[in-house]
UniProtKB/Swiss-Prot annotation:
Designated gene of the protein: purH
Domain MGS-like: 1-144
Source organism: Listeria welshimeri serovar 6b (strain ATCC 35897 / DSM 20650 / CCUG 15529 / CIP 8149 / NCTC 11857 / SLCC 5334 / V8)
Name of the protein: Bifunctional purine biosynthesis protein PurH
Domain notes from UniProt: The IMP cyclohydrolase activity resides in the N-terminal region.
Domain of life: Bacteria
GO biological process, one term: 'de novo' IMP biosynthetic process
Gene3D superfamilies: 3.40.140.20, Methylglyoxal synthase-like domain
């Protein structure tokens, strides 16, 4: 290895790396700020303009886009015609490229960043050099990650060159990196244009965690997050204590957080297998947790609990009495953390309940991807319609609105029975609506008397209304829209139940 081209925005570790290269007899070529850094460190360096015989121009937009650079990168060492061609133009081969790119992603995250600032942080020369070097990895070593500096130096010391396997691995890493870089730019500009579903989509994710296994032990898995994760998401969570999260933990935690984010008042959400098993609302977080626990004392065992307010000592004492996989909250008081951390394996996570919700949902199918707007539609209850003779009382309406927030997060067909403070029965995932209703009503038992019922979609027949009435339900909320709405309304009138139509469906598959 004779020549290295180094041009980096992130200069961490670059000086000792370059010093070692010089000790190994490698000539360093560099640009702008990187060159100045080397000169200050006393490292011999050749300026890029001395190689190209052309000055930087357009405020630095054009520096390395030159045949003297790309010819030296792309020439195949095993092809005589290539080597003769670069020799004829006094171009020397470049054996090592070390480049990291302008911080576009970091730039667009800054508050108040302008489009012009973002545009000026789109790197052109850097990706071009990386791609040229990576294409010719048979002869050229390319480094885009400082974590690979030591590997390259070790192989150079031991063999005088990097191995083919290392060059191939680093080239693949470069193409992933440049693809991800371009994807962030494409997504940023696409959002500015207002296109939601363009003809081509590009998304990039970073591996956050290797997982022991997936949904089942025979399935391999890893957890990837968006470059800029939403603040109130599992992707942005910080783990304070406990074992590593599993695949199922992450999915359940995501489901719990989505429900907790529906409420501004103190709420506790218990989830099993991505369905809520208990949701409680209270004047304080202790009351909210106790309501969630009482909603289903059996199913909460081994579950995930999300709370939207700080966990205090009293709440922690209650939670420490049962086995929970995960507790997620904005924060834990010092005393609460001490109480809960006595359990070695419990996972304690913090998530700031702030910021926006995911605007798009992505679901993979074999050979494709379904993308839809998230079910975060802000409903105006003023548009709801009472269609029965009996009007819901103020207390019933409060309960209906609370359960309506919850039912949309239950797998369809979904029925939720509850009050304004808690769920009392949840019927999820049945292939017919009456089946889900019977499960929810049976779970609620005697507590169904005086409670309300929420349905994520319309009633195809009046049997659910009749079952609800016989169990003691006093008010129902549902979208409406069935050709048999009149029959369901008549059944409600027969039993003196109030019914509210929202005209908004909340299927969840």
């Amino acid at each position: 290895m004779k020549r290295a081209l180094i041009s980096v925005s992130d200069k961490n570790g670059i000086v000792p790396f370059a010093e070692k290269l010089v000790e190994l007899g490698v000539e360093i070529i560099s640009t702008g700020g990187t060159k100045a850094t080397f000169e200050q460190a006393g490292i011999p360096v050749t300026g890029i303009e001395d190689v190209t015989k052309f000055p930087e121009m357009l405020d630095g937009r054009v520096k390395t886009l030159h045949p003297a650079i790309h010819g030296g990168l792309l020439a195949r060492r095993d092809t005589a015609e290539h080597m003769e061609a670069i020799a004829a133009h006094d171009i020397e081969p470049i054996d090592l490229v070390v480049v990291n790119l302008y911080p576009f992603q970091e730039t667009i995250q800054k508050p108040g960043v302008t489009l012009e600032e973002a545009i000026e942080n789109i790197d052109i020369g850097g990706p071009s050099m990386l791609r040229s070097a990576a294409k010719n990895y048979a002869a050229v070593t390319v480094v885009v990650d400082a974590a690979d500096y030591d590997t390259v130096l070790t192989e150079l010391k031991e063999h005088g060159a990097t191995t083919f396997e290392t060059r191939q691995r680093l080239a693949a890493k470069v193409f992933r990196h440049t693809a991800a870089y371009d994807a962030v730019i494409a997504e940023y500009l696409t959002k500015i244009t207002g296109e939601t579903f363009p003809e081509k989509v590009t998304f990039t994710y970073n591996r956050k965690q290797a997982l022991r296994y997936g949904e089942n032990p025979h399935q391999d898995a890893a957890f990837y997050t968006e470059p800029v994760a939403l603040l109130n998401s599992i992707s942005a969570a910080k783990q304070l204590h406990g074992k590593e999260l599993s695949y199922n933990n992450i999915r359940d935690a995501d489901a719990a957080l989505k429900i907790a984010n529906e409420f501004t008042e103190p709420v506790a959400v218990a989830v099993k297998h991505m369905n809520p098993c208990g949701v409680g609302v209270g004047e304080n977080i202790e009351e909210a947790y106790l309501k969630a626990y009482e909603a289903d004392e059996t199913s909460i065992f081994g579950g995930i609990v999300a709370l939207n307010k700080e966990v205090d000592a009293k709440t922690a004492e209650h939670m420490s009495k049962i086995f929970l996989e995960i507790i997620i909250a904005p924060s834990f008081s010092e005393e609460a953390f001490t109480i809960l951390a006595k359990k070695k394996n419990i996972r304690l996570l913090t998530v700031p309940f702030a910021g926006s919700v995911e605007s798009l949902e992505k679901t993979s199918v074999n050979g494709g991807l379904l993308i839809q707007a998230s079910d975060s539609f802000v409903e105006d209850s003023a548009g709801y319609e009472v269609v029965t003779e009996k009007q819901p009382t103020e207390a019933e309406m409060k309960a209906l609105l609370a359960q309506w927030k919850i039912v949309k997060h239950v797998k369809s067909n979904a029925i939720v029975v509850g009050s304004d403070k808690q769920t009392l029965g949840i019927g999820a995932g049945q292939m017919n609506r009456i089946g889900s209703a019977l499960i929810a009503l049976e779970q609620a038992g005697e507590k169904a008397k005086g409670a309300v019922l929420a349905s994520d979609a319309f009633f195809p027949m009046d049997d659910t209304v009749e079952a609800a009435a016989k169990a003691g339900i006093t008010a129902i909320i549902q979208p409406g829209g069935s050709i048999k709405d009149k029959e369901s309304i008549a059944m409600a009138d027969k039993y003196g139940i109030s019914m509210v139509l929202t005209h908004v469906r909340h299927f969840k598959h």
